[in-house]
Regions:
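Conserved pre-ATP/AMP-binding loop-to-beta segment of ANL
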Residues: 1-9, 16, 39-46
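Gly/Ser/Thr-rich phosphate-binding loop
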Residues: 94-98, 107-174, 185
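AMP-binding/adenylate-forming catalytic core of the ANL superfamily
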Residues: 89, 96, 209, 214-215, ...
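Glycine-centered tight turns that cap/initiate beta-strands
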Residues: 3, 111, 119, 183, ...
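Conserved AMP-binding A3 loop
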Residues: 5-32, 167
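Short beta-strand->loop structural element characteristic of the AMP-binding/adenylate-forming
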Residues: 19-21, 49, 71-78, 152
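Conserved AMP-binding/adenylation subdomain of ANL enzymes
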Residues: 28-46, 54-97, 105, 109, ...
Length: 323
């Protein structure tokens, strides 16, 4: 059970391709952890898997997990996002795992706008961050279509077989990616160190749990860069993600360390904090914040926002006036 059963390729924390060795224990741990959340699954329900099964998220949550938990699995190969609404109406799956963009697509699909979707038990988003504005839009859509629960969310990475936290049912704070799963610890540390930070303080999110990979295939040096044994005796995965834990144990994800924008005065700007504000404007469909050169100083960068509008160019002048 502790031998590698699959090698899943990922860019990991450095961006260069590498094979993640996951074990039977890794996938079984994910299934056992999710079984503790009865608000997520109930035996006999139908799960529609729209994620590719050759990635950890798609295989662990969309193939292995439902078979272990006694769910019916409908696998959609090579999903056309434009057909997602039609597929949901055709198969009526109570459960679905996807990325935030899938649910934004579903909420905007005219084919489902006047349909009763009360058959939906839990639709979960992972694999990417979601802004507060987008989360609000999706949850308003679900509530207006008679869905009991808001969109479930989770956080993880290939190196932990896809999932480390979950926000589901009523235990779901806006903006949070949830609480650590059963037998899993998530904490914020001073980046690259084993110094744990206080509640509410931003640092590098690190994960310790039973789904952790054996390592990167034939890359011991890169394995040593991400798997660190701390003084507590636990092996922690250093994710390269910046975030914090609140007083209730909910985890909040800000951005990749590499996305952090440092101004000329050393002030750290987290792109997600700006994106969360901008995304709540009704004219904004999507936005992304990047760092650009500061022409007034020899060092440091300034945040620059790219925006996709909801309705072509009609709001451009309005947004420009609000800069």
């Amino acid at each position: 059970p502790d031998h590698a059963c699959v090698v899943v390729h990922t860019g990991g924390t450095t961006g260069s391709p590498k094979g993640v060795m996951l074990t039977d224990n890794s996938f079984n741990a994910i299934a056992q952890q999710f079984s503790a959340y009865d608000t997520l699954f109930q035996k006999g329900q139908k799960l529609m898997n729209i994620m590719p099964p050759f990635i950890a998220y798609g295989y662990a949550c969309g193939v292995h997990l439902p078979m272990v938990l006694g769910l019916t699995v409908v696998i959609i190969p090579n999903l056309d996002p434009a057909k997602l609404g039609s597929l949901v109406l055709k198969y009526k799956p109570e459960i679905m795992f996807g990325v935030p963009a899938h649910y934004q697509q579903l909420a905007a699909d005219p084919k489902v706008q006047k349909k009763d979707l009360s058959f939906i038990h839990n639709y979960a988003a992972g694999g990417d961050a979601i802004s507060l504005g987008a989360e609000k839009t999706v949850n308003e859509f679900l509530a207006s279509h008679n869905v009991e629960y808001p969109m479930a969310k989770g956080y993880g990475m290939t190196e932990v077989a896809s999932a480390a936290t979950v926000a589901a049912g009523k235990n779901n704070k806006p903006g949070s990616v949830g609480i650590p799963m059963v037998n899993t610890l998530v904490s914020a540390f001073e980046p690259g160190t084993d110094k744990e930070l206080p509640i509410g303080q931003r640092g590098e999110l690190c994960i310790s749990g039973p789904a952790t990979m054996k390592g990167y295939y034939n890359k011991p040096d890169e394995t040593a860069m991400i798997l660190h044994k701390h003084p507590d005796g636990r092996v922690w995965v250093h994710t390269g993600d910046i975030g914090y834990i609140d007083e209730d144990g909910f985890v909040y994800l800000d951005s990749r360390i590499k996305r952090l924008i440092i101004r000329h005065d050393g002030f750290k700007v987290f792109p997600s904090m700006i994106e969360n504000v901008v995304s709540q404007h009704p004219a904004v469909h999507q936005c992304s914040v990047v760092g650009c050169a500061d022409k007034d100083h020899v060092q440091g960068r300034l945040p620059f926002v790219y925006i996709v509008l909801t309705r072509s160019e009609e709001h451009t002048s309005e947004l420009q006036s609000q800069r």
